[in-house]
UniProtKB/Swiss-Prot annotation:
A Gene Ontology biological process term: ribosome biogenesis
SUPFAM superfamilies: Obg GTP-binding protein C-terminal domain, Obg GTP-binding protein N-terminal domain, P-loop containing nucleoside triphosphate hydrolases
Residue ranges occupied by any OBG-type G domain in the UniProt entry: 160-343
Organism (species): Arthrobacter sp. (strain FB24)
Start and end residues of each Obg domain: 2-159
Function as written in the Swiss-Prot or TrEMBL entry: An essential GTPase which binds GTP, GDP and possibly (p)ppGpp with moderate affinity, with high nucleotide exchange rates and a fairly low GTP hydrolysis rate. Plays a role in control of the cell cycle, stress response, ribosome biogenesis and in those bacteria that undergo differentiation, in morphogenesis control.
Region of interest: Disordered: 466-529
Residues engaged in binding GTP: 166-173, 191-195, 212-215, 295-298, 324-326
Basic and acidic residues: compositionally biased ranges: 466-502
NCBIfam families listed in its UniProt record: Obg_CgtA, Obg_CgtA_exten, PRK12296.1, PRK12297.1, PRK12299.1
Keywords: Cytoplasm, GTP-binding, Hydrolase, Magnesium, Metal-binding, Nucleotide-binding
Protein name: GTPase Obg
Similarity comment: Belongs to the TRAFAC class OBG-HflX-like GTPase superfamily. OBG GTPase family.
Length: 529
């Protein structure tokens, strides 16, 4: 079973946003509480984060599908749904995030560096958030949107200052074990090293990292052997050290021919453009500082071979060191030479001012609508396809089982200018309109949207209980009516009081009282006769 994986294909999906809630507030003595549906929670994001404790991508090799949690639905009483939890995926330092076609998305260097691999979908609005002066009690809510889904490629490129390159069994693993505390696998057969090994070297006051990669053979840049698979690990290195085998027993090999083959493979290898310097240029591997280490000089023929090829190498401009990983001969001088190159590279980076990118201002055009309409033809019939972030997002948020929600979508599209643009494109009632790409929503277009919410008994976005709310008297009107009633009562009392003072009430009462005894005695007045 593999214990080291430096390239995986990861399938990530953000969480889906929660749906908004449709609810009406219910409380004692408040018959018209209004909408109180809460918003849905946002879906969780999938984030890649550099973790110094992670050294391989093995976990994602066994479990390549990762999904963040979904957002919770909204609830009544203005309660919003729970946001989905963010899924943090730890990756080693030096991980490069790419698309399947090779486009670099991020280069994760530095502890804690993060990259959002898949964003979660936003939650839908509840009917409380959708209410307005014209739409006081919406009977619908918006749906949550699915999170982003993508397939990304993770490639691990080791962070090292110096890279050891050479043929298999040249002694690279023995050299890194002798110069650092690393303990790679060492054996007397080719391709013992199957994974990159890192070691930390201290030379004076300079501390740097060296990388041992699997051996290179002729044709490694074309994929032969293991070199092409692991050459990416030397792309970040500031310098290279050619480890040449002076004790080889193969008749067709010698240090000079090995160096020529390795240099040719390095020249053919195309360095990733994401490792461009501060000036925007990529330094090829064969143009970087290089040292030559003639290894195995402790063998009987190794010393003679090193002395034989050294003048030729020095004449080519190489700094040559005769070393032995077994007896540690020449390792101190080689270590200080590496430290000198590393220090110079670090000083050059520190002295170079950071490149400041001027902000690019792209003001929105005055006539920019945020969408476009493309006219197509299907089955000899015209088809109009509406494309744009807003229309596509609005369609995903619409509950097409709710006529009021469809009417709300029609209002938004009309306000955006889609209907006017369809008229300009020559659309006629009954033509097919598709919002989105191949998987878009298909409509039979009607300019007045008679197939939608206009057929409702009440206006779009209203509650029938609020239909007569505009006819109810206001508090001021009620006060005026009460004052009018008080004035009318006062006027009636004043009129009665005036009649009483005028004696009208006294004469009529005295007359009725005088007539009552005569009726009781059986006598009548002259008028009655």
């Amino acid at each position: 079973m593999a214990s080291f994986v430096d390239r995986v294909v990861l399938h990530v999906s953000g969480g889906t946003g929660g749906h908004g809630c449709v609810s009406v507030h219910r409380e004692k003595f408040k018959p018209l509480g209004g909408p109180d549906g809460g918003n849905g929670g946002d879906g969780g994001d999938v984030i890649l984060r550099v973790d110094p404790q992670t050294t391989t991508l093995l976990d994602y090799h066994h479990a390549p599908h990762r999904h963040a949690t979904n957002g919770g639905p909204g609830m009544g009483d203005w309660r919003g749904g729970k946001n989905g939890e963010t899924l943090i995926l730890p990756v080693p330092e030096g991980t490069v995030v790419k698309t399947k076609d090779g486009r670099v998305l991020a280069d994760l260097v530095g502890e804690g560096t993060e990259f959002i691999a898949a964003a979660g979908g936003p939650g839908g609005l509840g009917n409380a958030a959708l209410s307005s002066q014209k739409r006081r009690a919406p009977g619908f809510a918006l749906l949550g949107i699915e999170g982003e889904s993508s397939d990304i490629v993770l490639e691990l490129k080791s962070i090292a200052d110096i890279a050891l390159v050479g043929f298999p069994s040249a002694g690279k693993s023995s050299l890194i074990a002798a110069m650092s505390a690393a303990r790679p696998k060492i054996a007397d057969y080719p391709f013992t090293t199957l994974i990159p090994n890192l070691g930390v070297v201290q030379a004076g006051d300079v501390r740097f990292t060296i990388a041992d990669v699997p051996g290179l053979i002729e044709g490694a840049s074309e994929g032969k052997g293991l070199g092409h698979h692991f050459l990416r690990h030397v792309e970040r290195c500031a310098a290279l050290v050619h480890v040449l085998d002076c004790g080889t027993l193969e008749a067709d090999r010698d240090p000079l021919s090995d160096l020529a083959i390795i240099e040719a493979e390095l020249e053919k290898y195309a360095v990733d453009m994401s490792y461009a310097g501060t000036d925007g240029e990529v330094v090829p591997l064969n143009h970087r500082p290089r040292l030559v280490a003639l290894n195995k000089v402790d063998l009987p023929d190794g010393k003679d071979m090193a002395e034989f090829v050294r003048p030729e190498l020095e004449s080519r401009g190489y700094r040559v060191f005769e070393i032995s990983a077994t007896s540690h001969e020449g390792l101190r001088q080689l270590g200080f030479a590496m430290a000198e190159i590393v220090k110079a590279a670090r000083d050059a980076v520190a002295a170079t001012p950071p490149k400041v990118h001027a902000p690019v201002l792209r003001p929105r055009a005055v006539n920019e609508a945020g969408f476009k309409i493309r006219r197509e033809e299907k089955n000899l019939e015209p088809l109009f396809r509406v494309l744009g972030d807003k229309p596509v997002r609005w369609v995903k948020q619409t509950d097409f089982t709710n006529e009021e929600a469809i009417g709300y979508l029609a209002d938004r599209l009309a306000k955006l200018g889609v209907e006017n643009e369809l008229f300009k494109q020559g659309a006629k009632p009954g033509d097919t309109v598709v919002i989105g790409e191949d998987d878009g929503v298909v409509f039979d277009w009607e300019p007045t949207m008679m197939a939608g919410a206009e057929l409702l008994a009440s206006p779009r976005g209203t509650d029938v209980r609020f239909a007569d709310i505009g006819d109810r008297p206001t508090r001021g009107q009620k006060r005026d009516e009460q004052q009018e009633r008080r004035d009318a009562k006062a006027a009636a009392r004043a009129e009665l009081e005036a009649e009483r003072k005028a004696g009208i009430w006294t004469e009529s009462v005295s007359g009725r009282r005088a007539a009552r005894p005569l009726q009781e005695s059986g006598l009548t007045t002259e008028n009655e006769e």
